[in-house]
């Protein structure tokens, strides 16, 4: 990486969403900006925080950040009203959960990918390095869309397995296991550097996807 680079970080999850991953990347971004790098964050999480040191590009619906919670709240408010209204919101919540569990690809944030694709010409391509952060895997799909023509240095940060995830898979494996494997393997072949926070995860992905050792790095968690 250059002494002072323009870095585009693609992470669907970021602050104020709290998780080990968002906390880790907040610390990394702080370190990058302290070293003089120019950082732009592309996210699907409404940036309800002061962002003096970075540029934030947000695509999403800030009025509906969590559809299930939104529907649950409306269902509660409907308790004192008509039973039919309460049933309607409860049904919508179940339909949404069914869709995310059995139909959505690659994961719950598939509509964010659509928003990025629709607005791709409005997203900056003035960067030296692009970094995509999962989970969700959608962040890597978005980075691929943006970097497809630019072909700048691509760093993938793998927080959790995608195709190799056995418990609580990100999508319907009966429908999408082939698609999962195809795109994960494709992205690993295109990325210049692939980060894993655990050596065991690195080794299992290296073996399964036949990733060259020179691309792989064990990056420290928090």
Where are the predicted features?
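Membrane-proximal helix-turn-helix segments that form the acceptor-binding/catalytic region
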Residues: 27, 113-119, 138-141, 145-149, ...
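A short, histidine- and acid-enriched strand-loop-helix "catalytic/donor-clamping" loop
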Residues: 15-17, 114, 118, 138, ...
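Active-site-proximal region of nucleotide-activated glycan assembly enzymes
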Residues: 152-153, 170-203, 207-217
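Active-site proximal beta-strand in glycosyltransferases
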Residues: 7, 129, 133, 144-165
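A conserved catalytic-core segment of Leloir-type glycosyltransferases
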Residues: 42-114
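N-terminal subdomain of nucleotide-sugar transferases
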Residues: 1-66, 193, 199-202, 213, ...
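Short N-terminal targeting/anchoring amphipathic segment
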Residues: 86-88, 116-139, 152-155
């Amino acid at each position: 990486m250059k002494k002072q680079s323009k870095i585009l970080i693609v992470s669907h999850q970021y602050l104020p969403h709290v998780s080990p991953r968002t906390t880790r990347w907040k610390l990394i971004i702080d370190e990058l900006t302290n070293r003089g790098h120019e950082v732009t964050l592309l996210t699907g999480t409404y940036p309800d925080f002061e962002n003096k040191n970075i540029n934030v590009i947000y695509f999403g619906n800030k009025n509906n950040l969590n559809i299930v919670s939104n529907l649950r709240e409306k269902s509660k408010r409907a308790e004192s009203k008509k039973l039919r209204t309460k049933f309607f919101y409860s049904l919508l919540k179940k339909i949404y959960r069914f869709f995310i569990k059995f139909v959505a690809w690659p994961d719950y944030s598939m509509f964010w990918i659509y928003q990025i694709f629709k607005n791709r010409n409005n997203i900056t391509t003035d960067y030296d390095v692009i970094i995509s952060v999962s989970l969700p895997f959608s962040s890597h799909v978005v980075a691929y869309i943006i970097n497809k023509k630019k072909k700048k240095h691509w760093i993938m940060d793998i927080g959790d397995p995608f195709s190799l995830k056995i418990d609580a898979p990100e999508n319907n494996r009966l429908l999408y296991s082939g698609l999962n494997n195809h795109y994960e393997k494709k992205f690993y072949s295109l990325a210049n550097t692939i980060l894993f926070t655990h050596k065991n995860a690195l080794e299992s992905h290296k073996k399964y996807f036949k990733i060259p050792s020179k691309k792989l790095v064990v990056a420290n968690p928090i």
